[in-house]
UniProtKB/Swiss-Prot annotation:
Pfam families: Ribosomal_L3 (PF00297). GO terms for molecular function: rRNA binding; structural constituent of ribosome. This is Large ribosomal subunit protein uL3. InterPro entries: L3_arc_euk, Ribosomal_L3_dom_3_arc_sf, Ribosomal_uL3, Ribosomal_uL3_arc, Ribosomal_uL3_CS, Transl_B-barrel_sf. Keywords: Ribonucleoprotein, Ribosomal protein, RNA-binding, rRNA-binding. HAMAP family: Ribosomal_uL3_A. Residues 1-31, 246-271 are annotated as: Disordered. It comes from Saccharolobus islandicus (strain L.S.2.15 / Lassen #1). GO terms for biological process: translation.
Length: 351
């Protein structure tokens, strides 16, 4: 008989379907954590992937066999220049019981960030003269009154923030990336005051995260293009020649003639998928690039010129890709202090 006599686990994960290209290069998280903090703060930040290196540090994981000893740790370097909040969005529950935007307030100070007109061209019409700027204030002044009058209905606030890629010459672009970041902690009134205070001002990553804490990483993986079932689903390659002569890097059958089941491995897009990696520890946050730049710079990136962070292990995405950093939604452990680093590799990455 030609049928197989032994069962095997299905290939691929149904939780990762559909395996298609991401619609956006910098995705916004779908879930935000609830933090117990009396003071409001942003729950996320945006950085750009530089590359990987390694450090030696004192292991401070409790109950670890190497606790208190020096260990080798691979790290990922991200360049994180300050971000600028441009607008405040208020969300309230609609008739369907789902949170939805009720209004959006833009501060006049947001227009000082001129690079935003490269992304939102309609804002350039408010920069022509003083009269156009006055129209801008009149248009969005009523939005702020609407937010204050509906404060009891509002579920949460989010800030529309812009990155500053102009400060990173290695990226070779000036158009900022826009993303929404939710405000957590404190009461609604305190969150509103916090948002109005930071609109149009630079926010550093030190205002959001601290060394030693766990965060989640949201981004888009490396694109691999069109791939077969062997690489895409890790299907076992069929025997060659003495078993059949119709190919080996394929599946034996796609199923009955009435139609192919959705769980049957088939070739298609591999990579450039939106993914989330949980509980990545921040090893270090530094302002001096000389502490991390290797001899000759990072391959396919160059040298770091702004504030940087070191994350434990590897993360998704290619070099120069924007990565969203979020407060951990389910941290496995809460560290009180930052790890002690004894050595940072600064040798050339070019071989």
């Amino acid at each position: 008989m030609g049928h197989r006599k032994l069962a095997s686990p299905r290939r691929g994960s149904a939780g990762l379907r559909p395996r298609k290209r991401s619609s956006e290069l910098l995705p916004t998280p779908r879930t935000w954590p609830q933090i117990n903090s009396p003071n409001p703060k942003l729950l996320g930040f945006v950085g750009y992937k530089v590359g990987m290196s390694h450090v030696f540090m004192i292991d401070d994981w409790p109950n670890s066999p190497t606790n208190g000893k020096e260990i080798y740790m691979p790290v990922t370097v991200l360049e994180v220049p300050p971000i600028i909040p441009l607008a405040l969005r208020a969300y309230a529950v609609d008739g369907k019981g789902e949170p939805n935007v009720i209004t959006e307030y833009w501060s006049p100070s947001s227009l000082q960030f001129l690079d935003i007109t490269r992304r939102i061209h309609s804002l350039s019409s408010f920069l022509k003269n003083d009269e156009s700027k006055k129209k801008f204030e009149e248009k969005f002044g009523s939005k702020l009154d609407l937010i204050k009058s509906n404060l009891d209905r509002i579920v949460y606030f989010r800030l529309l923030v812009a990155t500053q890629p102009r400060k990173i010459p290695s990226l070779g672009k000036k158009v900022p990336d826009l993303v929404e970041i939710q405000i957590g902690g404190g009461e609604k009134k305190a969150q509103l005051d916090y948002a109005l205070n930071v609109l149009g001002k630079e926010i550093s990553i030190k205002d959001v995260f601290k060394e030693g804490q766990l965060i989640d990483v949201v981004g888009v993986t490396k694109g691999k293009g069109f791939a077969g079932v062997i690489k895409r689903y890790s299907v076992v390659e069929l025997p060659r020649w003495h078993k059949h002569r119709k190919g080996s890097r394929k599946i034996g059958t796609r199923g009955p003639s009435l139609g192919t089941p959705s769980y049957t491995p088939q070739p298609g897009q591999l990579g450039f998928h939106r993914r989330t990696e949980y509980n990545k520890r921040i090893i270090k946050i530094g302002d001096d690039p000389k502490e991390i730049n290797p001899a000759g710079g990072f391959v396919r990136y160059g040298i770091v010129r702004n504030t940087y962070i070191l994350l434990e292990g590897s993360i998704l995405g290619s070099k120069k890709r924007p990565i969203f950093l979020r407060e951990a939604v389910r941290p496995s452990y809460v560290f009180e202090n930052a790890p002690k680093i004894t050595y940072v590799n600064l040798l050339s990455k070019q071989g």
